[in-house]
């Protein structure tokens, strides 16, 4: 495993991965099921994470709108999460952006619909009581 080397750190030493292992360890330990993490598992998880992020970014770039500008945007990632079956599990983590004004309008409409539903329920309950 030490044969595979990618990149260099600040001191000029070669590194297997580019993500900070300390951060990966903290994330892994945040799971209640994890009590200890050996170094090999940590390195493999970090490398797998890098490869996953690379795959997500590549797919999003190829299918995104920023290809002409050679740019990968958040919208490209969110669209990938919404449209790709492979990345569907990320839909809650990468939601499509929405303006606050649009969101507030949607909330008002939902509340109005709920109020109308409650009014209809109350009327039908009242009608049943009269019968």
UniProtKB/Swiss-Prot annotation:
- Where this protein primarily resides, as one coarse class? nucleus
The answer, when asked if Protein transport is one of the entry's keywords, is: no
Q: By its UniProt entry, which Gene3D superfamilies does this protein fall under?
A: Histone, subunit A
Q: Which residues carry this modification: N6-acetyllysine?
A: 102
Q: Coiled coil where?
A: 100-124
Modified positions (Phosphoserine) in chain numbering? 124
Which GO molecular function, any one, fits this protein according to its record? DNA-directed DNA polymerase activity
GO CC list: CHRAC; epsilon DNA polymerase complex; nucleus; pericentric heterochromatin
Q: Where is the composition biased (Acidic residues)?
A: 112-131
> What tissues has this protein been observed in?
Expressed in heart, brain, placenta, lung, liver, skeletal muscle, kidney and pancreas.
Positions of modified residues (N-acetylalanine): 2
Q: Is DNA-binding among this UniProt entry's keywords?
A: yes
Q: Where is this region: Disordered?
A: 109-131
> Where is the protein localized?
Nucleus
Example of a GO biological process term: nucleosome assembly
Q: Which domain of life is it from?
A: Eukaryota
Task: Enumerate the CDD domains for this protein.
Answer: HFD_CHRAC1-like
Q: Which InterPro entries match?
A: CBFA_NFYB_domain, Histone-fold, Transcr_DNA_Rep_Reg
UniProt keywords, alphabetically: Acetylation, Coiled coil, DNA-binding, DNA-directed DNA polymerase, Nucleotidyltransferase, Nucleus, Phosphoprotein, Transferase
The record describes its quaternary structure and partners as: Heterodimer with POLE3; binds to DNA. Component of the CHRAC ISWI chromatin remodeling complex at least composed of SMARCA5/SNF2H, BAZ1A/ACF1, CHRAC1 and POLE3; the complex preferentially binds DNA through the CHRAC1-POLE3 heterodimer and possesses ATP-dependent nucleosome-remodeling activity. Within the complex, the heterodimer with POLE3 interacts with SMARCA5/SNF2H; the interaction is direct and enhances nucleosome sliding activity by the SMARCA5/SNF2H and BAZ1A/ACF1 interaction. Within the complex, the heterodimer with POLE3 interacts with BAZ1A/ACF1; the interactions are direct.
**Reported function:** Forms a complex with DNA polymerase epsilon subunit POLE3 and binds naked DNA, which is then incorporated into chromatin, aided by the nucleosome remodeling activity of ISWI/SNF2H and ACF1. Does not enhance nucleosome sliding activity of the ACF-5 ISWI chromatin remodeling complex.
The name this protein goes by in its record: Chromatin accessibility complex protein 1
What species is this protein from?
Homo sapiens
Q: Which gene encodes it?
A: CHRAC1
């Amino acid at each position: 495993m030490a044969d595979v080397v990618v990149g260099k750190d600040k001191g000029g030493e070669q590194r297997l991965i580019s993500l900070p292992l300390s951060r990966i360890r903290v994330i892994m330990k945040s799971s209640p099921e994890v009590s200890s993490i050996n170094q090999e598992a940590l390195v493999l998880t970090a490398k797998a994470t890098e490869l996953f992020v690379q795959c997500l970014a590549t797919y999003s770039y190829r299918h995104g709108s920023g290809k002409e500008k050679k740019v990968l945007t958040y919208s490209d990632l969110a669209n990938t999460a919404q449209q790709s079956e492979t990345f569907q599990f990320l839909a809650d983590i990468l939601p499509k952006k929405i303006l606050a004004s649009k969101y507030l309008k949607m909330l008002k409409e939902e509340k109005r619909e709920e109020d109308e539903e409650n009014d209809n329920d109350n009327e039908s309950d009242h009608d049943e009581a009269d019968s």
